[in-house]
Amino acid sequence: MKGLYIHIPFCKQKCKYCDFVSFPCMEDTADKYVDALKREAEQYRGEKLDTIFIGGGPPSILTPKQIEEVTKMCFDVFDVASDCEFTTEANPGTIDDDKINAMLNGGINRISVGVQSFNDDELKKIGRIHDSKTAYNTICHLDKMGFQNINLDLMTALPSQTFESLKNTLNTAVSLPVKHISAYSLIIEDGTPIEKEYSKGLLDIPNEDTDREMYMYTVDFLGKNGFKQYEISNFAKGGYECRHNVKYWTGEEYIGLGTAAHSYIGNCRFYNTSDINEYIGGAEKEVIELTENDKIAEFMITGLRMNRGVSKTDFKSRFGKDINDVFGSEFDKFIKLGLMQYIDGRYSLTLDGINVSNSILCEFV
């Protein structure tokens, strides 16, 4: 079965670090956009799905009626498994009871809340529209309303973030009724407001060494509090790993609907335009046929992000080659350095390897 990703490119206020495709939300434009989603979905009518993920600007910016239309489309057009994991993203400050009810009634059973921090000063410096109290109350209310599978997103290496403020954020996070936590380091993207402020010396952002120490502390703290790391940036209580994202990391097929979304089907990737007007107007997809080397590189880079790593057997069945014939020298080098390990037929990163994963993964391209 495939996964389905739906991109909602609207936001109330763009965060200072964000370089994603997003636009101010006007109801008439959003209505046209939802109609365009329905039109695109028809290209895949009857496809079997066992995961759905609505992401973007966030989706909670939509009206209850628009949320209802999007969820109804999923079940009308696709063959959705009875145990489908159906996730939507939401931000504190953009959600209310009518929207929550539309989500639950529409079959959504998992929600990912963009908290980032429980420190108000840090939130202001990255341009979030909510404060820590709103974030805390939102998660408690989602639980009360019936969401039993809640993820919260956190960020480290934020402007003025200290170990003390990080510890407070993590303590608050694990005290909440959540089953999954994602923790990402702030990446300063070119052309974003935060990059401009940083280049002018207006922000005190933790250096690379401190960022790594914060990451290692986060991994250790979450593990001790029942959240097992299963991917570089993702932690879950038993049985609550994000099945949709695992599809990406294990090279399974998925469909992408909406601006800037892409699909992976067969040997091809299909890319949608990032221009919302072109998308609403029915712009054609860009199609790129993947070479075997492309697929091998993706298999390695995404697979090694997961704690379980990559399987020799899986590699052989997919590509008809022994993984050691292709990457034997790389494995030997990183195992000797203590950055990788080989256990029960799988190559994976050690904790030290995870800490410098970017430099390791580029060796497998």
Residue ranges and their predicted role:
Residues R346-T350:
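Minor-groove-contacting beta-hairpin "wing" of winged helix-turn-helix DNA-binding domains
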